[in-house]
Design a protein with these regions (language model features):
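Short, flexible active-site loop motifs that bind/organize anionic cofactors or intermediates
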Residues: 10, 47, 77, 96, ...
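Active-site beta-loop-alpha junctions enriched in small/polar residues
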Residues: 23-25, 48-50, 76-80, 108-111, ...
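Structural preference for beta-strand elements that scaffold enzyme active sites
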Residues: 15-19, 43-44, 70-76, 102-107, ...
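N-terminal binding-site loop/beta-alpha segment at the start of enzyme catalytic domains
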Residues: 1-71, 132, 136-139
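Short active-site-adjacent helix-start/loop capping segments
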Residues: 54-55, 81-83, 115-116
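Glycine/proline-rich, positively charged
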Residues: 87-155
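Short, charge-rich binding segments
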Residues: 63-66, 82, 96-100
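Active-site mouth loops of central-metabolism enzymes
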Residues: 16-28, 76-85, 119-125
Length: 155
């Protein structure tokens, strides 16, 4: 059963506590999954470019009977992107794949590219800051939130 409970971020934005994750759902099937989830009350969805299903997620949202403003959409910046221009292009490309006007939350999926995790000591601090700096140039209609995900202290 869907919960409409939210968490309040420091900036006042409310994020749904439960989002339907779309990892491992192929692009053709995810459209139907999104529509069925909306029909039972889900209003928040999580995807990523690496999942290969952003287009289907967008179609599922676009073809539903629910207003876009009532849906909370999260996607992720590919782990290999660690620069200002790459971030801009990734957001524009994601919007094209979704065929939607904005993304509610963009997560920086990992501080390191996947192939480097736990192997290379470069933590990409400058690159991640470049991802973050790009947010100040976003128009509000493109993206509400830019958040770091899977950042941890190495022990």
């Amino acid at each position: 059963m869907y919960s409409d409970k939210t968490l309040m971020l420091n900036n006042g934005v409310e994020v749904p506590r439960i989002q339907l994750g779309t990892w491992l759902i192929n692009n053709d099937d995810v459209r139907k999954v999104i529509r069925q989830a909306i029909n039972v009350g889900y209003r928040a969805f999580d995807t990523a470019k690496d999942y290969g299903n952003e287009s289907g997620v967008g179609k599922g949202i676009w073809n539903s009977d629910v207003e876009r403003s009532d849906i909370f959409l999260t996607t992720k910046l590919p782990t290999s992107i660690k620069d200002y221009e790459g971030t801009k292009k990734a957001i524009d490309d994601a919007l094209d794949r979704f065929n939607l006007e904005y993304i509610d939350m963009l997560l920086i999926h990992s501080p390191q590219p996947w192939i480097e995790v736990n192997r290379i000591n470069d933590r990409h601090f400058e690159g991640n800051l470049e991802n973050w700096r790009w947010k100040k140039h976003l128009k509000p209609v493109k993206l509400d939130q830019l958040v770091f995900q899977i950042f941890y202290k190495k022990t």
